[in-house]
Amino acid sequence: MSEKFILSIDQGTTSSRAILFNHKGEIVESAQKEFEQFFPKPGWVEHDANEIWTSVLACIADVLRKADIEANQIEGIGITNQRETTVVWDKNTGRPIYKAIVWQSRQTEGICKELKEQGHEDTIRHKTGLLIDPYFSGTKVKWILDNVDGAREKAEAGELSFGTIDSWLIYRLSGGKTHVTDYSNASRTLMFNIYDLKWDDELLEILDVPKSMLPEVKPSSEVYANTVSYHFFGEEVPIAGVAGDQQAALFGQACFDQGMAKNTYGTGCFLLMNTGEEPVRSKHGLLTTIAWGVDGKVEYALEGSIFVAGSAIQWLRDGLRLIESSPQSEALASQVETTDGVYLVPAFVGLGTPYWDSDARGAVFGLTRGTTKEHFVRATLESLAYQTKDVMDAMLADSDIDLKKLRVDGGAVKNNLLMQFQSDILGVTVERPVVQETTALGSAYLAGLAVGFWKDKEEIAKQWLNEKTFENEMSEEESSYLYKGWQKAVEATRSFKFES
C-alpha cells in the first residue's frame, strides 16, 4: 500500500507554499511561488486574488511532482493563511470585484477614525477582542463596498461574497460550491462575536456590511469540502483543516495547554499564549483572539503584534547596506559583547503591542564617536528581543500566568545570538523546535485530526521535538538595567512627533 500524506497550503503575504508532511510530522517536500505586491498609494498594500489562487495551484502541482507521488496519496488538505487580508467576489461569476486588501494596508484609516469618533471602540473591543485598526478585515470590506462602483448595490442584492484568504481558496478548490471559514480567521474580521461564536448583527450594522456576504463559520478541524477533481489531478480530496497563520503556528508548536506560548519571528513578530476555554480580556493592549476550535471545544489566546522584526534586518541589508545577507547579522553582532549603550527602536510603521502608536517613527539612541557598524547591527537584533519582552510583560499582567518557557519559530530563530539574548532579557527558557515550519505543520495537524491521520492532540504533542534550548545566562540586575534603557528609548521615540 502506498504511503499517505497530508498536504498543507501555506498562503503567506509574499508567497504561497505547499508542504507535504508524513505521519511523523516530518517535511517530505515543499514548493514555493512568489506573487506580485501592489502599492497603489503610500501605505496601501494589495494582492491579486486570482494570482494567489494560481500560485497555490502551481505549488500543489510542483510539490506532487517533486515528491513523485500521486494525488490519491493525499489523505487531507490543511490551509493556513495570511490573516485579515480581504477578498470580495461576485457570487455569479466567482470573480473578485477588487484586488485583495492586505492586512498591512492602511487605506482604511479614515474609516477607523470615523468609527472611533462615533464612539464604537468599547463595543467593538468588548465583542471581538480587537481594536479599531485598519489591520482587521471589517473596515476593508466596508472600503470596497463604499469605493467600488456598484458594489454596495450588488451586496445589498445578495450578489457578493466576502472571505479571508482561506475562504477564497476553499471556494476555488471546491469549484465554487463551499463558502466557509474557521473560528480563528473569523475572529480577526471585526465582525465576529468571539463569545457567542456568531457574526454579530450590531457590528455588521456599525460597519454597514450585509450578512449575506459572510461565510459560514466552522471549527478549525473538520471536513469542509472536497476538492473538485479538475483542480486536483482527478481526485476529490478532503479540505479538512484551517487556521490563520499565527494560530496555526501555536497549534504546530503543540501549545495545547493553558499558559503555553510561542513567538514567530517573521517580517514582524507574533506572540500568542493559549489561555484555555475562557477568553481573557486584555487591559494592556493585547488582542483577545480565538486560537482554534477542535474536539468540540473553542480555545482562546492572547496575542501581541510586533510590526517590525525581520524587516529591520532586511533594512540593514537593503536600506543601509551594512550587511550583505541576513545571516551575516549574527556574525557581525557577535564581534562586540554589547551594543555599548546603543538602542534602536524600529518604529518604521509605528509601534504595535502594547503601545498601538501609529504615529511613532524609528529612532536610534546612545550613539557616540566609538559606535561601530557591529554595535548598530547588534542593537537592531536586540530590538526584536526587547519588543518581545514588551509583549510578554503585558501578557503576564493580563493572565497572571508565570511563563517558564517560550517556543520559537520563523526565519530569525536560526540566529543563536538573538535567541540567547531573548532568553536572557525575558529570564525564561527559549525552545527552538526541529521542524520550524510550524505554521504549515499546524494546519496539517488540524486536517490530519479531522480525517483520522493522527488520533488526537496527545499523539501530536509527542511529535514535537526540541532542536536547541537557550537558558538564561544574565543576572536579573543586568537584564533589568538593559530593559530600562530600552523603555527610555521607546518613550523618547513616542514623544518625538514632527509635524510638517
UniProtKB/Swiss-Prot annotation:
Keywords of this entry: ATP-binding, Glycerol metabolism, Kinase, Nucleotide-binding, Phosphoprotein, Transferase
One MF term in the entry's GO annotations: glycerol kinase activity
Phosphohistidine modifications at: 231
Residues bound to ATP: 13-15, 267, 310, 314, 411
One family name in Pfam for this protein: FGGY_N
InterPro entries listed in its UniProt record: ATPase_NBD (IPR043129), Carb_kinase_FGGY (IPR000577), Carb_kinase_FGGY_CS (IPR018483), FGGY_C (IPR018485), FGGY_N (IPR018484), Glycerol_kin (IPR005999)
Binding positions for sn-glycerol 3-phosphate per the UniProt entry: 13, 83-84, 135, 245
Example GO biological process: glycerol metabolic process
Activity modulation: Activated by phosphorylation and inhibited by fructose 1,6-bisphosphate (FBP).
Assembly with partners or alone: Homotetramer and homodimer (in equilibrium).
Protein name: Glycerol kinase
Source organism (scientific name): Oceanobacillus iheyensis (strain DSM 14371 / CIP 107618 / JCM 11309 / KCTC 3954 / HTE831)
